[in-house]
């Protein structure tokens, strides 16, 4: 048997039938895991596991940079972003880079810079990943005790948790600083149809910020997804960043209490399951946010939300028929309800027809036409601006519907166009990934609990049929 760098390499779990197969010196014999078990071979090799994580970060950042440059290369300034299948440039535009009034792109150079910076960063991370995977020390405990750890060392684990929380808090403050001091962010609610502005009057009232968490997730309430002004969003990031940083300091300075030591499983696989569970919650929340929220995800870049496209259609035909002489206040539709306008269950004047179910939509092109009791009839007759008509006609024809083969629009519509909204892509992908991560959470939590309880993980390999077959090679 080979001389081991660290005695903690032994982790016998599975038996590979072909024991001679070795991969880069990390074989079944020395790790207890077969080559296909991936990072499980590195559970007790902190140096190699560091390499795997840094290399993975490099791949992520490389994708971001390459995809960013790909989108810049294909970008047509004359078309809205949401018509071009872009998923990265809308995020940069939302942060206020390269856009002017109405969400019009005035400069693509910041997008190019972003892509190049990510590519350069990915090269650094890639080098670090390869170095630690192949050349660096297998374990960090002996040479660099600050970066070393033992999975069951509860104090060290909460210290690592604290460092991560501080980094997340600093990330939240990066958005705050961008909005306050570095040019501002794009505000879809700015007068006249959206603009980049600095957020000066932050919402820091805890009753408002934490009130979102106490709202119902249904209907017009919408939990945190209902946030509809940037002051609240940036103020929320101040609160969240502060909580993360203070919580991080707390976890670095303290040891877990007895109830926490008893309640949790303290192993590498358990921490993996906790992380996957958290990411699953992030994915499901992001799905709801990108689907329903047109403030954090402005419609100028991501296309209209479903309710927004529906209300835009009602508005467009109200404008048309009013010009043709219809009395939109009293016209009756085929159901006996108002054809253009009707009353909501609570008495507000809302758009009639099928779009009545979306009556709690709020959108910057529509709100100026509301009064104290819903839509204001006199404003609908006298105050509609050309930009509102143009925008609603555009949104009406770009509903976030569409199939994977890029045939957009209503499924029964024969004149459908090649259009799938980025909202559809981002909401669907985050829902599906959130679900997969949840399954991964259950899987690894089950394995971690089984290991902690002391019963065998996996299947008994002693009498596995493949052990008695002739090797393929």
UniProtKB/Swiss-Prot annotation:
The keyword Chloroplast applies. GO terms for molecular function: chlorophyll binding; electron transporter, transferring electrons within the cyclic electron transport pathway of photosynthesis activity; metal ion binding. HAMAP family: PSII_PsbC_CP43. It is a multi-pass membrane protein. It is found in: Plastid, Chloroplast thylakoid membrane. The modification N-acetylthreonine is found at residue 15. Belongs to the PsbB/PsbC family. PsbC subfamily. The modification Phosphothreonine is found at residue 15. The chain crosses the membrane at residues 69-93, 134-155, 178-200, 255-275, 291-312, 447-471. GO terms for cellular component: chloroplast thylakoid membrane; photosystem II. It holds the Pfam family PSII. NCBIfam families: psbC. Residues 1-14 form a propeptide. It comes from the Eukaryota. PSII is composed of 1 copy each of membrane proteins PsbA, PsbB, PsbC, PsbD, PsbE, PsbF, PsbH, PsbI, PsbJ, PsbK, PsbL, PsbM, PsbT, PsbX, PsbY, PsbZ, Psb30/Ycf12, at least 3 peripheral proteins of the oxygen-evolving complex and a large number of cofactors. It forms dimeric complexes. This is Photosystem II CP43 reaction center protein. [CaMn4O5] cluster binds at residue 367. One of the components of the core complex of photosystem II (PSII). It binds chlorophyll and helps catalyze the primary light-induced photochemical processes of PSII. PSII is a light-driven water:plastoquinone oxidoreductase, using light energy to abstract electrons from H(2)O, generating O(2) and a proton gradient subsequently used for ATP formation.
């Amino acid at each position: 048997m080979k001389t081991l760098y660290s005695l903690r390499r032994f982790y016998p779990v599975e038996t590979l039938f072909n024991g001679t197969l070795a991969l880069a010196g990390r074989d079944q014999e020395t790790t207890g895991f077969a080559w296909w078990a991936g990072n499980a071979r590195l559970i007790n090799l902190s140096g190699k596991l560091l390499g795997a994580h840094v290399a993975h970060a490099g791949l992520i950042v490389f994708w971001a940079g390459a995809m960013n440059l790909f989108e810049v290369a294909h970008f047509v300034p004359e078309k809205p972003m949401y018509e071009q299948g872009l998923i990265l440039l809308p995020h940069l535009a939302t942060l206020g880079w390269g856009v002017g009034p109405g969400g019009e792109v005035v400069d693509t150079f910041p997008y190019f810079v972003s892509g190049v910076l990510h590519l350069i960063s990915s090269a650094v991370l890639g080098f670090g990943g390869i170095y630690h995977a192949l050349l660096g020390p297998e374990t960090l405990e002996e040479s660099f005790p600050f970066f070393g750890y033992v999975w069951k060392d509860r104090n060290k684990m909460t210290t690592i948790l604290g460092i991560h929380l501080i980094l997340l808090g600093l990330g939240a403050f990066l958005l705050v600083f961008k909005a306050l001091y570095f040019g501002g962010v794009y505000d879809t609610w700015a007068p006249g149809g959206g603009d980049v502005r600095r957020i000066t009057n932050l919402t820091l009232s805890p009753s408002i910020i934490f009130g979102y968490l106490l709202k119902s997730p249904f209907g017009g309430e919408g939990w945190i997804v209902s946030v509809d002004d940037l002051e609240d969003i940036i103020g929320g990031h101040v609160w969240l960043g502060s909580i993360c940083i203070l919580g991080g300091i707390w976890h670095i300075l303290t040891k877990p209490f007895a109830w926490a030591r008893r309640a949790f499983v303290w192993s590498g696989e358990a921490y993996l399951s906790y992380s996957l569970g958290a990411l699953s919650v992030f994915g499901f929340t992001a799905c709801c946010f990108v689907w329903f929220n047109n403030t954090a995800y402005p419609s100028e870049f991501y296309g209209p939300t479903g309710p927004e496209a529906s209300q835009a259609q009602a508005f467009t035909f109200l404008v048309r028929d009013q010009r043709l002489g219809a009395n939109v206040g009293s016209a009756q539709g085929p159901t006996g309800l108002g054809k253009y306008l009707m009353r909501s269950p609570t008495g507000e004047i809302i758009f009639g027809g099928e779009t009545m179910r979306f009556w709690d939509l709020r959108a910057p092109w529509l709100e100026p036409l509301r009064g104290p009791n819903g839509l204001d009839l006199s404003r609908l007759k006298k105050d509609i601006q050309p930009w509102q008509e143009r925008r609603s006609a555009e949104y009406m024809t770009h509903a976030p519907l569409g199939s994977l083969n890029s045939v957009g629009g209503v499924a029964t519509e024969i004149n459908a166009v090649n259009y799938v909204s980025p909202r559809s892509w981002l909401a669907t992908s985050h829902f599906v990934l959130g679900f997969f991560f949840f399954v991964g959470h259950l899987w690894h939590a089950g394995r971690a609990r089984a290991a902690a309880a002391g019963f065998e993980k996996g299947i008994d390999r002693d009498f596995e049929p493949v052990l008695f077959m002739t090797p393929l090679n």
